[in-house]
Amino acid sequence: LDLIHYNKEKLNLNIKEFQYNIFDQVDGEKNPCYLCARKRRGALYNKAQELGCNKIALGHHFDDVIETILMSLIFNGEFKTMMPKLKSTNFKKMELIRPLYFVREKDIISFCKYNDLHFIDCACSVTKKGIGMRKKMKDLINTLNEYYRGADKNIMNATYNVNLNTIISSINYIFISTPIILI
């Protein structure tokens, strides 16, 4: 908490602190990352509504977005992305925004260093151990960029350039009576 207070003073921010024991609640779960993200977002929405707010802003950046795209492709077999802005389905009149959506992680780190800002590491045990799927995706993207310059940008660009005529679910094939799912 000392780093949070340091940054608060440095940036002259008026903040309110709220504590939750979400990490304890998801420890030992089969899919702790997904559950933790849902619980943290729910806690933020609840507190925002309680304070009379209509938006929550999350710090997801460009690198988070492309890591999420790859995780969805590789682990869930679906093409989807995290949106920069969306309306909550569970909290009426609430909206989620991601103002850093197009900002690279390295640029955020440079900004923090230049302005002598210090941020706390995630308290998540999976992140601390460096064993989570997001870390693996980060490593994969770095490897792809070593071999294919701009691979990270093209992953993001693919979200804008979806050709629906080449997506199997959008075409009715006479010779396929039921969808084929590879297992």
Regions found by a protein language model. Name each.
Residues 21-26, 49-56, 90-99, 108-110, ...:
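Low-complexity, flexible helical/coil segments
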Residues 117-183:
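The feature marks non-catalytic terminal segments
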Residues 1-70, 75-78, 83, 106-114, ...:
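ATP-dependent adenylation/nucleotidyltransferase module used to activate substrates
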Residues 29, 33, 37, 59, ...:
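Alpha-helix initiation/capping motif
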Residues 63-136, 140-143:
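Catalytic subdomain that performs nucleotidyl-dependent activation
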Residues 39-51, 85-91, 140-159:
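Short, basic, helix/turn surface patches
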